[in-house]
């Protein structure tokens, strides 16, 4: 049985363990594997031999710390040194030196790499596992056609087909196919060997014609026939070594290299015993595959399910980094060969250090982290986002699928995903189902398969034994589907339980169960596991919720959720956001930027993150939680980070909510809020924006940073220091200069002032002119300057320009247009902010904070929000925090409702407030209109759910255009806020205006104000004076563009006036 056995109680594994273990696997095994593949390199005359001694390779500790690498925009990497020897064969002398091969970017304990100062993460990819797969499809006549597809390690495919006459063909391209006998002969088998190694020789002999015999008479004839069919070459090609090399490169290397996983799969599927180190496709494989295909034709053996996880493999971080390392070594080999040849040609004495350069390895990894689709910038919106990003699984990327070509069956949930890939958490849109998320307990096995843990059930003993099973193994067992908690193993099991067996879901007796799940969260990803009462929600809304939690903005004053699932602490700790003590000791002092801890007689300074910007412009900040003189233990929390409180994840706020319509202001998911949320900074967040400018050396001279900028008003330069850079702590508004910069340029003779011309004519003095190219604060960027960085790269050439970065902090209260959401997919936009006295209020006089539309619940089927809402109210009144595991209904029916009502009843008794739990309408209460003081007609659900403020904020989206840039070709306004673009009056907008018959407005929108070059210059003036826009004589630019397009197709479009008289004459003549 595949899997590790562990008798201990299961705990949730480290949530970033997948990434970190993958990188450690690359450093332990992948690095040496690729170095051992590096060949011995000889010169053309075979006098000198170069080789690497892998056993003595060294990785040097990084010269800089992670924090400094981020601050100075450097790569956090380690230098790789290997011993190399140069052997002179004539004298048998050897020169050995330790050479520097290049830098390898390191991974930190959170599973991320720092490249050029940016946190990056490598996504795990799901690929079709190499091997052979049999399937059946109906042709156009409705007859089943059986095919066997051999998939190589590189993703290349070779298809075997069997036709109606039981002849077997190998399809080498979309249009060409050749006989299986020709392919086997071209691979080195003769007819006798073929017939001896197959189970059905009579079928092979049945389609062996005289023509076929001639083709496979010799290996050369078979290769020529194969080449002719594969390359679609006419005539009679001649057998040569170059022809064999071309076939080897184009066909055999791409479609016949199985790799170690492919060899294992082929051996298992075809019952072969070929050694594991033989990773290429052999004639034995082809013949065994053909035999099995014949068996399939006659109904022997099962077909393969291509979407089953046993037929998939995970290309992990280790595989991707190892592939890149191998590619870099191939490039290094070419460099060494070229250098040796050059040294001998110029009669120089080479040394190992002179032959090797670090450029191939360093540039390969830089381009991989910068350009590869599976290497992404780490999303650092909040702590949950950082962890979830590293646990993604993607079907996309090199060798994988694309969003356009993937069909529905690939995107759909498969029974083998159970406990391995979350059935809920995926992206929305074109990539739905193609980007998934690992289940909490899943891990990547040795052969690249996803493994999930189960408890093995013993009949006579209560001892628990934990096994990790791959997808190919667990379908042979009866698996009980989460019928008890791991924490409560002593519970008497039910007589009949739901179970899974061979991809079917059954109900069986408990005595028949072999394995059971270890935890209720086992099937879900981290995002879905943070949703309380998830079993009461529709899966589509749970999907939205797990995505929206990743978009929550860290608030200035975070707050724990009253109702949670218990995973909040683990997520916060594994994200690395809180500061945690590495060893026990005593706090000597605490400051805003560091904590000093004494342990074993030494004082250790622990730096804290201070107002650091994430790549989504959110503020990362740590606040000390320990006081001076306090003794702490190892693992204790020293400081809370963004969106964490007491070491628990805290993404939002517990606010008082009523579900009721209010004057139409919460129509269609709009949300009504109280001004208390603004004035008391309940949903206030800090955002840090980065603005940068570079200084180059131009052909006219270097650009200058200065505070003396001509022709600019003084108040725009008020914040600059003597160097021309904005001062720390300055408050800046839109249009202010952040960095003053002048770029030299040559002026035309006509642009000189008269006195400048005189100086040139008499004294020959060249008057220099400069263009102002300052960094200005764009619209919506007002705030406080909190940091200025001047990054100077080594060797300040024109290719390495100096960069000045200015960081500005903004304080954003919640406002109309911001997006808020709960944890059940209930999202909405703030429509109105009401005064406190106008909000509906409870029977104890408290006004509610938010009013949601109750119609958003029934049709969306996310009833979990109502359970959370009521339990949150009870928890706030009783001062309790609830942690609810999912699927609690397995203990008793209506368990969730009983829990909520019992807590409400207890809160009602303890606080002496009968309105908290009224038996006539439990969970609801009579509330009053704040404007009139009268009660509303119907009782209303009130409660305290956990509401998040999302990163989709109105300040980043609102945009207006009065003047701006135009496209060069169409002369129409550009598109998008970043380009100061305009709104497009599209086809449907035109229909709406046509419905009202507003011809003049339509003409203005489509011509004068858009792409009529002359008319748009007169629009502003005529609007100010109240006149009418003069009617232009010529056509708008887009019409002229159409005319030019038609001319390019040799179609001339002319217009001329036809009078009524001429029209009648022409009609009479006709």
Curated annotation (Swiss-Prot):
EC number(s) on file: 2.7.7.6
NCBIfam families associated with the record: PRK00405.1
Presence of keyword Transcription: yes
An MF annotation (GO) of this entry: DNA-directed RNA polymerase activity
The protein, known as: DNA-directed RNA polymerase subunit beta
Subunit record text: In plastids the minimal PEP RNA polymerase catalytic core is composed of four subunits: alpha, beta, beta', and beta''. When a (nuclear-encoded) sigma factor is associated with the core the holoenzyme is formed, which can initiate transcription.
Lineage: Eukaryota, Viridiplantae, Streptophyta, Embryophyta, Tracheophyta
Entry similarity comment: Belongs to the RNA polymerase beta chain family.
Highest taxon listed in the record's lineage: Eukaryota
Species the sequence originates in: Gossypium barbadense
Record's function text: DNA-dependent RNA polymerase catalyzes the transcription of DNA into RNA using the four ribonucleoside triphosphates as substrates.
